[in-house]
Amino acid sequence: MSIYTRPVMLLLCGLLLLTLAIAVLNTLVPLWLAQESLATWQVGMVSSSYFTGNLVGTLLTGYLIKRLGFNRSYYIASLIFAAGCVGLGMMIGFWSWLAWRFVAGVGCAMIWVVVESALMCSGTSRNRGRLLAAYMMVYYVGTFLGQLLVSKVPTELMSVLPWVTGMILAGILPLLFTRILNQQSEEHDTTPITSMLRLRQARLGVNGCIISGIVLGSLYGLMPLYLNHQGISNASIGFWMAVLVSAGILGQWPIGRLADKFGRLLVLRVQVFVVILGSIAMLTQAAMAPALFILGAAGFTLYPVAMAWACEKVERHQLVAMNQALLLSYTVGSLLGPSFTAMLMQNYSDNLLFIMIASVSFVYLLMLLRNAGHTPTPVAHV
């Protein structure tokens, strides 16, 4: 029986449309703010507001899924995101957009938690890696296509908002034709996120999501700046970023399959080692194409493998709470990593980007090389 059941396929179709909308807005909102002559710090504050919304949305979604189930939680999350999009056209200004991007951030995080939790609850330990790999492939393909759309369509605010809002609402439609069951038993109370963060046997998975956030946040946010400082043109920067993201897309399926077959711990060790090798290759200014490719293939696949590993360590009724904890960890890493790395790059050298990535990866590799321990097979494995 295929792991890609009808509910899974429809869920991923809806996610693709929503990811397109997310990618378009995340690219254009800073440009729209700049056109309104807002100061750089104000543009940064609006971006931070969106990520703050991500944190809040992550914390809220477990309760919503427990009370309403996956389908209705998905509808509500999509409508919140749509409201955050429509609000941008109601009033253009710093404080207004600060609020509406916060709302959009809440909606986006809720969508991610619902989709990831639904996929994990739909799978088993034998196929969860492939399900999450498919999720990440859809996410990165949607991001790539969103960037492509920005380069092909008019980018004026009132030209973009109608069709982006329509795309968000269209993302609801696939789930109207199926029902995703929440297999979390009613007799279990809602599991606190803090207990998942403290769970000793899942700590390597949680730490892996933090490291993944640091690595991906730094690559996404600071790689274009690094390339620019190397004298590379904007067009060429776009090409090299495409190489990086494409490697991440191509790596999802084989690495997910290898993780299901040989175990997540072994695959995580190899991935982190390859990230270190890719960082060293960039520092030595060796052939950039293969260096970026292996960095993207290993770095962009850390999150789903770490997530699947952590989810092996909990019972089925704890999967939603664990997913919240992992997404929260990733978000914290993606906020702190680029901020700290950017300060180091500004004060010392651009090479600190890869030194930082290699350093945090090395620390995580040491954790992975220690005895991970053996725990009884939990219900989530079945």
From Swiss-Prot:
<dbReference type="InterPro" id="IPR011701">
    <property type="entry name" value="MFS"/>
</dbReference>
<feature type="transmembrane region" description="Helical">
    <location>
        <begin position="349"/>
        <end position="369"/>
    </location>
</feature>
<keyword id="KW-0812">Transmembrane</keyword>
<comment type="similarity">
    <text>Belongs to the major facilitator superfamily. YcaD (TC 2.A.1.26) family.</text>
</comment>
<dbReference type="InterPro" id="IPR023745">
    <property type="entry name" value="MFS_YcaD"/>
</dbReference>
<feature type="transmembrane region" description="Helical">
    <location>
        <begin position="102"/>
        <end position="122"/>
    </location>
</feature>
<keyword id="KW-1133">Transmembrane helix</keyword>
<feature type="transmembrane region" description="Helical">
    <location>
        <begin position="45"/>
        <end position="65"/>
    </location>
</feature>
<keyword id="KW-0813">Transport</keyword>
<keyword id="KW-0997">Cell inner membrane</keyword>
<protein>
    <recommendedName>
        <fullName>Uncharacterized MFS-type transporter CKO_02171</fullName>
    </recommendedName>
</protein>
<feature type="transmembrane region" description="Helical">
    <location>
        <begin position="235"/>
        <end position="255"/>
    </location>
</feature>
<feature type="transmembrane region" description="Helical">
    <location>
        <begin position="79"/>
        <end position="99"/>
    </location>
</feature>
<dbReference type="InterPro" id="IPR020846">
    <property type="entry name" value="MFS_dom"/>
</dbReference>
<feature type="transmembrane region" description="Helical">
    <location>
        <begin position="131"/>
        <end position="151"/>
    </location>
</feature>
<dbReference type="GO" id="GO:0022857">
    <property type="term" value="F:transmembrane transporter activity"/>
</dbReference>
<dbReference type="InterPro" id="IPR047200">
    <property type="entry name" value="MFS_YcaD-like"/>
</dbReference>
<feature type="transmembrane region" description="Helical">
    <location>
        <begin position="291"/>
        <end position="311"/>
    </location>
</feature>
<dbReference type="GO" id="GO:0005886">
    <property type="term" value="C:plasma membrane"/>
</dbReference>
<feature type="transmembrane region" description="Helical">
    <location>
        <begin position="325"/>
        <end position="345"/>
    </location>
</feature>
<dbReference type="Pfam" id="PF07690">
    <property type="entry name" value="MFS_1"/>
</dbReference>
<dbReference type="InterPro" id="IPR036259">
    <property type="entry name" value="MFS_trans_sf"/>
</dbReference>
<keyword id="KW-1003">Cell membrane</keyword>
<feature type="transmembrane region" description="Helical">
    <location>
        <begin position="8"/>
        <end position="28"/>
    </location>
</feature>
<feature type="transmembrane region" description="Helical">
    <location>
        <begin position="270"/>
        <end position="290"/>
    </location>
</feature>
<feature type="transmembrane region" description="Helical">
    <location>
        <begin position="204"/>
        <end position="224"/>
    </location>
</feature>
<keyword id="KW-0472">Membrane</keyword>
<feature type="transmembrane region" description="Helical">
    <location>
        <begin position="157"/>
        <end position="177"/>
    </location>
</feature>
